[in-house]
Amino acid sequence: MKALSKLHKEVGIWMTDVPAPELGHNDLLIKIRKTAICGTDIHIYNWDEWSQKTIPVPMVVGHEYVGEVVAIGQEVRGFAVGDRVSGEGHITCGHCRNCRAGRTHLCRNTIGVGVNRPGAFAEYLVIPAFNAFKLPDNVPDELAAIFDPFGNAVHTALSFDLVGEDVLITGAGPIGIMAAAVCRHVGARHVVITDVNEYRLELARKMGATRAVNVTKEQLSGVMSELGMTEGFDVGLEMSGVPSAFQDMIDKMNHGGKIAMLGIPPATMAIDWGKVIFKGLFIKGIYGREMFETWYKMASLIQSGLDLSPIITHRFHIDDFQQGFDAMRSGQSGKVILSWDK
């Protein structure tokens, strides 16, 4: 079958022909319809330090997808051939303490689809049926293909009560922008997002951010004054992994403020812990999506009118995958969809 693979320990992704995956007793075989390019895929493409330590070569990559079930393992219940599904890209062990306690997103033995095992940039994908999510009919394929990163946004944004709160989001990548849309949809008062990329800040404005701030041109303190904020932000969502952005967030938080961190900073990051302590800040690390509460919330948010369509800015056939990767690497895109239809 046709697949996109990391074939060489250098910059690039290559179209290859690989054997179709084998179906296990508890698995689903999914015919892929659409996939989306993730920031992780760009790290793998660029063959950065993380990729060199993590990705076995060769490896079929990709983990954001929607497809149709075409075969079912003999032990599987609850799915049928023809079901339209997306799926959780974190394969968990099922036997560690967190898995047994129902906190599967915190499994210490997690294996990543398209990272540690063959991924979704292929004509067919096999995953455990446990990881599949059956999609409502009114969730279109393009949105279903980005449920993985949308789930990161939902998990992060809904970590804290948002109704009537003022929210600061640092990092206007696609996940940060979707988080801004979620915050507004569920009732936040002001949602301010910061970045240095004007293209993506404009996307954030289209998605409902109260203010999208280029921190090279504008001070957050001035924006807060314009919005009539006198006590700081109630909730912070750190999506950038940039130390200076996190420092600024800590400075601008209200006493008792709550911060959820999804962005991955450098290996070490110095912060003023005195401010954290004396402000009584709560900081929570976010990894992946809660299985499967986040997935049900994603579907419900879309069904209740949340419009994510502006975040999808580029669409290509899989044969033109290089154009898709070029668009993502340029920084002048939102989400990029690759279609696998003939």
UniProtKB/Swiss-Prot annotation:
Known cofactor(s): Zn(2+)
Annotated Zn(2+) 2 binding sites: C93, C96, C99, C107
Pathway: Amino-acid degradation; L-threonine degradation via oxydo-reductase pathway; glycine from L-threonine: step 1/2
Stored InterPro entries: ADH-like_C, ADH-like_N, ADH_Zn_CS, GroES-like_sf, L-Threonine_3-DHase, NAD(P)-bd_dom_sf, PKS_ER, Zn_alcohol_dh
Chief localisation class: cytoplasm
Gene3D superfamilies named among the record's database cross-references: Medium-chain alcohol dehydrogenases, catalytic domain, NAD(P)-binding Rossmann-like Domain
Residues where Zn(2+) 1 binds: C38, H63, E64
EC identifiers of the protein: 1.1.1.103
Free-text comment on the cofactor: Binds 2 Zn(2+) ions per subunit.
Residues of the site described as Important for catalytic activity for the proton relay mechanism but does not participate directly in the coordination of zinc atom: D148
Keywords, ordered alphabetically: Cytoplasm, Metal-binding, NAD, Oxidoreductase, Zinc
GO MF annotations in UniProt: L-threonine 3-dehydrogenase activity; zinc ion binding
Localization terms from the record: Cytoplasm
Active site: T40, H43
UniProt GO cellular component terms: cytoplasm
UniProt xrefs under Pfam families: ADH_N, ADH_zinc_N
Residue positions binding NAD(+): I175, D195, R200, L262, G263, I264, I286, Y287
Swiss-Prot/TrEMBL catalytic activity: L-threonine + NAD(+) = (2S)-2-amino-3-oxobutanoate + NADH + H(+)
HAMAP family from the UniProt entry: Thr_dehydrog
PANTHER family named in the record: L-THREONINE 3-DEHYDROGENASE
Subunit record text: Homotetramer.
Similarity comment: family membership: Belongs to the zinc-containing alcohol dehydrogenase family.
NCBIfam families found in the cross-reference section: PRK05396.1, tdh
Record-given protein name: L-threonine 3-dehydrogenase
UniProt organism field: Aeromonas hydrophila subsp. hydrophila (strain ATCC 7966 / DSM 30187 / BCRC 13018 / CCUG 14551 / JCM 1027 / KCTC 2358 / NCIMB 9240 / NCTC 8049)
Lineage, broadest ranks: Bacteria, Pseudomonadati, Pseudomonadota, Gammaproteobacteria, Aeromonadales
Gene that encodes it: tdh
